């Protein structure tokens, strides 16, 4: 049976249809908004795999290029490995949905959202999250939703729900927010140095609209008559759990007081081994032994949280708002254009900056067409940073997500291309990690940009905030969380910004929502922490270096008329190649007439710029030019005084004395000085070497 419902979501009319397409999926919905058509499907295994002790959820967002009537690029002409922007939207779907499955539910779940028809004015991220929630809500799969997603922009101080692709360009805020009827569960976005109050106002605005779409989903599920599966949870051995707690509580409590991550992990491991060996004397069942390991993890969770909530004590002895010790190094590497090392506790990021030219832009394909990026931040998280051994491969979803967050934090303080015409690549190499490595990347990246001479608007710092809460409403907000506190806490909230305001924000929860009272506490405490970090960073470098590295390219920009681009390029690129061969510089010409000239040194770039200027300069009567003899005739020499502009120096004007043969005085290829005597109506140029010599 087909079920359809429609409703208003801000300015958009949303239509939901099920029962016609993808009927064998456990949940499927066709989601429409204007010309945007999404198909969201979800399937779940009937039972968890034997021995499964985690929730295997896969979320995949895919853009089909046929949705805009285009062929995919590449040899095979089909969609292949997902590009970064699809991975980022997949993560936006995954992060708010994951904590809303029942605790202990370990059946494999696969959620897919596909763009079947695109609308160039509609931004997809919020709609994709909505479609995913609808598919889960109307399925028989256990899910503590529904939730809704909202993309929030702000233009001239006015908040906008689901701004168009054109509106978002002029917005000083770009947030994707997910929530239930009453609480926010996920935030991801960037802002142009907005205040805490402005950010909270945007979140309240989002929450109001989110509640509307959650209500629509509830009505839809009621219309369909959804019946959820029974969750099969493994029975707990209460007696064994009590014995484990009695034997291990004091040992685990002592081990958890160790501030050093490596030492602490070893001590916890030793306690766990000791407990397992002790109970093996009386417990023979292998499944029971595995249960003991689970109970030990639960006990550690209980110990860490009890210390924070009831004693106000963190495992490493810090106050709740205390930042770990910070150290900074500027330009530790001699070869790169700029570098820094930012260390906070046992988290360390090496930030490295490379300056490039227009040809180094990153080009990528989206539903809107080909796009280019002139700033990129790449985040690398090698196994050695956490003392592990694993196969090295390309960046995973986590690395792409962390890099994107740090990139968004920094890109809004970069100078405009007119002021600093370089392509910029920042790489964050995580050398060691104990929590908050993405925010360490923001700090090392900001420092390295200044060290490289990039005139950013201000230093940017980032901090990760945590939350411990209980069912009574008691909570504690933690600044600069370590890996242990991230693992056992309820929230990982990352906030980056300058002294003026916030530039990037990301929040993920392990609980079903967080109140605005808590969010206000988080923002206020995070700001104090960010400013403390900025104080330390700015003691080492507070403004961009006055000069670029010797190995950095030198760039000069020229703007030429769009209708004369072809003149500069020349037939088959002849002119551009000629300039490059003569000067060693490279030219990058954009469709709007912007010409970026880059040389390995200033002299090379200036020489090429002078030649570019020559193509569009007007010949001035009475001016002396240095030109190249291009051809020789019996009656004179043809001299190129500007690129593409030749004049005739008659034999009578080549020298003071009588000249029998032009070749007696000049030869092809000679560089000579000539004076412009006249330019007639047809553009013919009359030159004189003799007059130029008189003025020397």
From Swiss-Prot:
Residues 622-690 form the S1 motif domain. Its main location: cytoplasm. GO terms for biological process: mRNA catabolic process; RNA processing. One of its GO terms (cellular component) is cytosol. It is an enzyme of class 2 (transferase). It catalyses: RNA(n+1) + phosphate = RNA(n) + a ribonucleoside 5'-diphosphate. InterPro entries: ExoRNase_PH_dom1, ExoRNase_PH_dom2, ExoRNase_PH_dom2_sf, KH_dom, KH_dom_type_1, KH_dom_type_1_sf, NA-bd_OB-fold, PNPase. Mg(2+) binds at residues 486, 492. Pfam families: KH_1 (PF00013), PNPase (PF03726), RNase_PH (PF01138), RNase_PH_C (PF03725), S1 (PF00575). Keywords: Cytoplasm, Magnesium, Metal-binding, Nucleotidyltransferase, RNA-binding, Transferase. Its cofactor is Mg(2+). Its EC number is 2.7.7.8. NCBIfam families: polynuc_phos, PRK11824.1. This is Polyribonucleotide nucleotidyltransferase.
């Amino acid at each position: 049976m087909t079920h359809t419902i429609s409703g208003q979501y801000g300015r958009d009319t949303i239509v939901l249809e099920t029962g016609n397409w993808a009927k064998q999926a456990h949940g499927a919905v066709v989601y429409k908004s204007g010309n945007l058509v999404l198909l969201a499907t979800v399937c779940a295994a009937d039972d968890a795999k034997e021995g499964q002790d985690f929730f295997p959820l896969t979320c995949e967002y895919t853009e089909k290029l046929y949705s805009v009537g285009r062929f995919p690029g590449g040899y095979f002409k089909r969609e292949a490995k997902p590009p970064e922007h699809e991975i980022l939207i997949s993560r936006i779907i995954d992060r708010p949905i994951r904590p809303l499955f029942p605790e202990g539910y370990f059946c494999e779940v696969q959620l897919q959202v596909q763009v079947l028809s695109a609308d160039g004015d509609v931004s997809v991220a919020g709609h994709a999250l909505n479609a995913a929630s609808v598919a889960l809500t109307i399925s028989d799969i256990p899910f503590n939703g529904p939730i809704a997603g909202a993309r929030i922009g702000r233009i001239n101080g006015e908040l906008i729900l689901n701004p168009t692709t054109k509106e978002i360009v002029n917005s000083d805020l770009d947030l994707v927010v997910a929530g239930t009827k009453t609480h926010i569960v996920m935030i991801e976005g960037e802002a142009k140095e907005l205040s805490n109050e402005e950010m909270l106002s945007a979140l309240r605005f989002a929450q109001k609209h989110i509640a509307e779409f959650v209500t629509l989903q509830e009505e839809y599920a009621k219309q369909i008559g959804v019946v959820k599966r029974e969750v099969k949870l493994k029975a707990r051995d209460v007696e064994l759990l009590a014995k484990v707690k009695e034997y291990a509580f004091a040992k685990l409590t002592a081990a958890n007081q160790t501030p050093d991550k490596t030492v602490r992990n070893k001590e916890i491991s030793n306690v766990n081994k000791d407990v397992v060996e002790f109970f093996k004397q009386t417990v023979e069942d292998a499944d029971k032994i595995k249960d003991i390991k689970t109970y030990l993890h639960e006990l550690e969770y209980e110990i860490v949280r009890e210390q924070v909530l009831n004693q106000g004590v963190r495992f490493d002895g810090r106050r709740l708002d205390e930042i770990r010790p910070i150290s900074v190094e500027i330009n530790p590497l001699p070869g790169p254009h700029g570098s820094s090392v930012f260390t906070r506790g046992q988290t360390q990021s090496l930030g490295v900056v490379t300056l490039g030219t227009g040809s180094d832009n990153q080009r990528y394909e989206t539903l809107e067409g080909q796009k280019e990026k002139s700033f990129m931040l790449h985040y690398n998280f090698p196994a050695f940073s956490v003392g592990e051994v694993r196969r090295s491969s390309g960046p995973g979803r986590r690395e792409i997500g962390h890099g994107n967050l740090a990139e968004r934090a920094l890109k809004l303080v970069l100078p405009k291309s007119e002021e600093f015409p370089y392509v910029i690549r920042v790489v964050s190499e995580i050398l060691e990690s104990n929590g908050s490595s993405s925010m360490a990347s923001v700090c090392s990246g900001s420092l390295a940009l200044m060290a490289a001479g990039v005139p950013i608007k201000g230093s940017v710092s980032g901090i990760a905030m945590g939350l411990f809460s209980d069912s009574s409403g008691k909570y504690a907000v933690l600044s600069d969380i370590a890996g242990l506190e991230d693992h056992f806490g309820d929230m990982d909230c990352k906030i980056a910004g300058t002294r003026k305001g916030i530039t990037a924000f990301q929040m993920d929860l392990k609980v079903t929502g967080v109140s605005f009272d808590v969010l206000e506490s988080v923002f206020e405490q995070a700001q104090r922490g960010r400013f403390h970090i900025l104080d330390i960073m700015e003691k080492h470098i507070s403004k961009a270096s006055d000069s670029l590295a010797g190995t950095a390219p030198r760039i000069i920009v020229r703007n030429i008329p769009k209708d004369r681009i072809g003149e500069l390029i020349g037939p088959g690129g002849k002119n551009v190649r000629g300039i490059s061969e003569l000067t060693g510089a490279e030219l990058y010409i954009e469709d709007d007439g912007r010409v970026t000239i880059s040389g390995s040194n200033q002299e090379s770039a200036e020489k090429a710029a002078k030649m570019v200027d020559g193509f569009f300069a007007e010949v001035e009567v009475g001016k002396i030019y240095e030109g190249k003899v291009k051809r020789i005739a019996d009656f004179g020499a043809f001299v190129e005084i500007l690129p593409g502009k030749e004049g005739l120096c008659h034999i009578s004007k080549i020298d003071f004395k009588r000249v029998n043969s032009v070749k007696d005085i000049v030869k092809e290829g000679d560089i000579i000085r000539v004076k412009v005597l006249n330019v007639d109506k047809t553009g013919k140029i009359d030159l004189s070497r003799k007059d130029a010599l008189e003025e020397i």
